[in-house]
Amino acid sequence: MIKKRYLVISDLQIPYHHEQAVKNLIKLVKREKFDLVLNTGDELDMQSQSRWAQGTKLEWEGTLDADRNLAQNILYDLGTTDVTRSNHTDRLYNTLLRAPSLIGLPELEYSKFMDFAGLGIRFHKKPFEFHRGWVLVHGDEGSMNSNA
C-alpha cells in the first residue's frame, strides 16, 4: 500500500496571520514534500467585507487587493493544493448580495477572484473527500451556531 502524506492548514486569516508560524509552515512544506497541502478555509480574513464592518470606517479600509495578493503569495509558497469554502470565503458573495446586479460576474466568484486555477489550487464548495474516509471541511459546516 502506498502511503500518502497530507498537511492540513486552517484559518490563516490573512492579513492577521502569525507571520513566523507561516514562515515555519513554508519551511516544513519544503522539507517534507507532502502529497497534498489542504486548507480548511478562512485563508483570507476579508474583515472589511464582514457584517461587523458595515457602517464603520473598516468597511472603507481599501486593503482587499493587497490582502488578496498576500494570501495568493502565501498559498503559493505553502504549495496549497486544495481549499474548501468557509464562512470567510462566503463574505465576498454576501457582500455582493447588497449589490445583486454584480452577482454572476465570473471575476467575482471566489475561486476566480483568488485566481486559484492560476495558482494550481482546487476550490471545493462542498466537503471534499481527499482520502477514503477523510473529508476536508470548514468548522462552520453543520454548526449549530448561526454566528460561525
For each predicted feature, which ranges?
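Acidic, His/Gly-enriched loop-helix segments that form or flank divalent-metal centers
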Residues: 93-148
